[in-house]
Each structure stands twice: as C-alpha cells, then as structure tokens.
Amino acid sequence: MRVLVITGLSGSGKSTAVRVLEDEGFFCVDNLPVLLFPTIIDLVCRSGENVAGVALVMDIRGRDFIKGFEKVFQQISEAGHTVEVIFFDATDEVLVRRFSETRRRHPALESGSVPEGIRYEREQLAGLRRLATHVIDTSELNVHQLKELVHSRIKGESGTRPLTIHLQSFGYRFGIPLESDIVMDVRFLPNPHFVPELKAGTGLDENVRTYVLEKPETRQFLERFMDLLEFLVPSYQREGKSYLTVSVGCTGGRHRSVAIVEELRAFFAGLGLVVKVSHRDKEKG
C-alpha cells in the first residue's frame, strides 16, 4: 500500500494537496493521531477498496505526532508499505499574509502573534522536514500551480509518467528555492548587469544570452554540468524519482541564471524528458 504523509506549516497548502489526492483516488484522513497510522492502513488494506493509496494529513494540531513519527514510520515500512512524506512550506512573510487574509489565528499557539506561531511550528516540525521525501515551497505558487505540481509528483511517483525535469532560475538575494533537488550557482559567470546596453534586459533576450553563452568559461561550464546531469538523471530514475527540480541561481535571477536555464531546456528535451521551466525572480532582479 502506498502511504503519503501530508505535512508542513499551517497555511502552506496542505488542504489543496488533499483535494488533489482525493481526485486521484487516495483515501484521505485529516489530523489522525500517529499511533493510529498502522490501524487505518490495515483497515483500508482489508476493506478491498480499489484505492490509489492512503494519504494522512498530520500537522502541529497532533502534538503526539511530532514525538512519535519515526518509530511509527519504521513500523509501517516493515509491514511492507511505502511511506512518502510530502512537506509543504512557505516563507514566513507569505504565511503571515495568508493568515491575515483569512483572519485565522495560528493553530500552534493558543495565544501570541502569528509570527510567533510560525516560528514555534518550524521548530517543532524541523525533524520531520529533514525526513521528507519531497519539500514543496508554495510561496510563489497560486492554487492552480500548486494543484498541477502536486498532481505531477503524485502521478509520476506511481510510475504513470516519465521523469519530469523542472528547471528554474532564481536570484540568491531572494533565497534558494526550498524544493530544489539540485542547485547550481552561476555567479562566477560574466554578469550582463554591468554592461549598460544589457542591464535592462533579461536572459531571454538574444543579446543577453549571446553575451553569457559565448564566453569560453560558460561553454566549459555547460559542457561539464550537462555531463554531470546526463549521468545523474538515470540514477534518479532507477531510484524511482519522477520529478527532479534543478535550480540555477545568479545574484538577481535576471540575466545569467535565466540564460543558462534556457540552454538546459534544450538539453533535457533532447534526452526525451518532460521539461518545465520557470524564472522565479526574472522581474525582481
């Protein structure tokens, strides 16, 4: 039986993920005490129902969950089930804004401010986050994008889709994307920001791309990085991974990282892989 544990910070999108899982045929249970994990899984198995798996939503409301999850996960795995932990996250700023929009109090604390609740929840869930199979940062996602991302990862993990590569550019000044599997820093490449006629452009503009890509150090870097990726992709596939996020960062996320990601798009497409591209900070940098 495939068992998904949906967890993460309050306000990060877990409820949206559950709706996607229900549509995909998962038996979903919200806020179940950790000690009842094995029981509910056993009941679903015995019922004979044709379900895609069991999805259990666990968060800060289940205090005993935080204390006993490792032992229970091991027990479930030893029973022959596959346990995947999907951790939903977002920046503190985004979470505060979401709570403000919904006018809800933070569930982690009966009293105190929302920022205090977020900090406390992060501390309590830190160990679980380290064990996560996937970390999904929803800070920059709308509801439709989040649904698509969850759908892609869930369907891919069941083996119905080929490996999907998500290439994204970002700016280090805005933070590393939390959902990254591979992060490449390209701040060592020549920076168009300091060329007056290129500064206002982006890595999607032909003159900016030419400036970045025609430098000898860029060509050498791409050759070596592509060799590494070509080696890694089959290894990830053998491990059952179906969604690989490769993040490329420069200072502002506007010029170099964008140009490199666009070059990698063609490379991965040439390998016959499904490729999705996003430029997170292109308009910020």
From Swiss-Prot:
User: Which residues are involved in binding GTP?
Assistant: D59, I60, R61, G62
Keyword GTP-binding present in the record's keywords: the answer is: yes
Alphabetized, the UniProt keywords read: ATP-binding, GTP-binding, Nucleotide-binding
Molecular function in Gene Ontology? ATP binding; GTP binding; molecular adaptor activity
Presence of keyword Hydrolase: no
Residue positions annotated to bind ATP are G8, L9, S10, G11, S12, G13, K14, S15
* Highest rank taxon of the organism: Bacteria
Q: What does this protein do?
A: Displays ATPase and GTPase activities.
Family from the record: Belongs to the RapZ-like family.
Q: Which NCBIfam families match?
A: PRK05416.1
| Protein name stated in the entry | Nucleotide-binding protein GSU1884
Q: What is the lineage of its organism?
A: Bacteria, Pseudomonadati, Thermodesulfobacteriota, Desulfuromonadia, Geobacterales
